[in-house]
Amino acid sequence: MYFPVSALLIEFMILSIVNREDSYGYEISQTIKLVADIKESTLYPILKKLEKAGYVTTYSAEYQGRKRKYYSITEAGKTQMAYLQGEWKSYRDTIDDIIEWRKKNDEWGISETIGKVSEEASAERL
């Protein structure tokens, strides 16, 4: 199952990938495609943006007679990755709280009551 991902989340994934080891574009895209349905036409502008911001640097290396462009994280990129990791944790915790709250309230029958109240309030506005 794929969930929609924002450009910011893709940036976070890219920085996380190149933090582990220098990687080339296709390799990065294949790793991200394990969890998100993205196209190279989406990925490369984000890589360029990260390079322009100073979060990654690039270098070329030959592999089986062909040149590959590798991306390497910078210290600024590590700082940005840590920031995005904090944002991701906060986002994930919020989603988990909503899901857990819903489960608990379903067990207690509260969600059903809240749903009815919301429907009634919506009907009154019409």
Locate predicted features:
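Alpha-helical DNA-recognition elements
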Residues: P45, K49
